[in-house]
Amino acid sequence: MSKIIDIKTSIVTIPLKRTFVTAVRSTNHIDAVVVELSLDNGNKGYGVAPATTAITGDTLQGMQYIISEIFAPVILSSNLSDYKQTLELAFKKVMFNSAAKMALDLAFHDLLAKQKNISVAKLLGAKNNIIETDVSISCGSVAETIQNIQNGVEANFTTIKVKTGADFNRDIQLLKSLDNEFSKNIKFRFDANQGWNISQTKQFIEELNKYSLNVEIIEQPVKYYDISAMREITKFSNIPIVADESVFDAKDAERVIDEQACNMINIKLAKSGGILEAQKIKKLADSVGIPCMVGCMMESPAGILATASFALAEGITVADLDPLDWVAKDLYSDYITFNEPNIIIKDNLKGFGFSF
């Protein structure tokens, strides 16, 4: 089997069409690190991951250092066929740094698929190539939020993810306007990004129950580390509670499951450190009947392709993969068709189908 003979990193910056605002950050661009792995047979594999410092702690320069100085000595001269053991050894060298791990994990999967002349989705076992995403609505005034939701509905999205948690009074006031303005055919997801406390979350749920909104989930209402609060809210709520920032890896998933601290887990490759750990989370959740969704950071279309490939292989249908709506279509037209709200992975890709 071929050996890894070179590893390089680079930085890419992708402008957004509009500013993305959550309870924890605001940005008008995507920063990411690209990994290029070279095999001795000439094949190259690419992986990419975002530097979402406010959530994962990763920085661009830190990711490059971890990959080039800590992971590379383990990776170089390794056999591609030993990728699982190689990545395990490399990742044991450093705690956290999940985005750096994601970029490397994806580059290995890209190479594995290219060696077989198939797409990563097919390598992972996907039987189809279409997944539906919601669209995220940034934090803003009630009027701005309503207008942005209307824009999303006009763009054919049927599921709307409303960012909350930055201003609780606005969050409460918003509910009446949503109930007045939108058809019950529109499904809503509310994501507080850790911005509420227990009492605020309960108040929000009680207020929600006064209306007839079609609400699917409430995501990560409180701080990621407050598992007891997540448990109390999950027990209280008649709406499914999703653990997002509370679950990075399989150990985190085991904890929230044991504590009955959620009804669903949001798997993100930038949290899990790539596909291999994401598969472990999904397997664990399946074993106890906890459903999973897939999400993402505000990240590159290449990262969205990787997550969509994983989701399709795992049979996950609840997806929050809308950065495609925030960037220019020509950035991903070689490997994805985005017919809002459907993400369609193109046929006959070799590996992921992207390069940098």
From Swiss-Prot:
**Which positions in this protein are listed as binding Mg(2+)?**
191, 219, 244
Q: Where does substrate bind?
A: 161-163, 268, 320-322
Q: Which cofactors are reported in the record for this sequence?
A: Mg(2+)
The keyword Mitochondrion is assigned to this record: no
Return the EC number. 5.1.1.20
The entry's free-text remark on the cofactor is:
Binds 1 Mg(2+) ion per subunit.
What InterPro entries does the record point to?
A: Dipeptide_epimerase (IPR034603), Enolase-like_C_sf (IPR036849), Enolase-like_N (IPR029017), Enolase_C-like (IPR029065), Mandelate_racemase_C (IPR013342), Mandelate_racemase_N_dom (IPR013341)
Q: Which domain of life is it from?
A: Bacteria
Gene3D superfamilies, per the entry: Enolase-like C-terminal domain (3.20.20.120), Enolase-like, N-terminal domain (3.30.390.10)
- GO MF entry, a single one: magnesium ion binding
Q: Which UniProt keywords apply?
A: Cell wall biogenesis/degradation, Isomerase, Magnesium, Metal-binding
Main EC class the enzyme belongs to: isomerase
Which catalysed reactions does the entry list for this protein? L-alanyl-L-glutamate = L-alanyl-D-glutamate
Output one GO BP term.
Answer: peptide metabolic process
**Protein task:** Dipeptide epimerase with a preference for substrates containing a Glu residue in the second position. Catalyzes the epimerization of L-Ala-L-Glu, L-Ser-L-Glu, L-Thr-L-Glu, L-Val-L-Glu, L-Gly-L-Glu and L-Thr-L-Glu (in vitro). May play a role in the metabolism of the murein peptide, of which L-Ala-D-Glu is a component.
Q: What else is known?
A: Part of a large, functionally divergent protein family. Protein modeling and substrate docking were used to predict the substrate specificity, prior to biochemical analysis.
Family per similarity comment: Belongs to the mandelate racemase/muconate lactonizing enzyme family.
Name the record gives this protein = L-Ala-D/L-Glu epimerase
Origin organism of this chain?
A: Francisella tularensis subsp. novicida (strain U112)
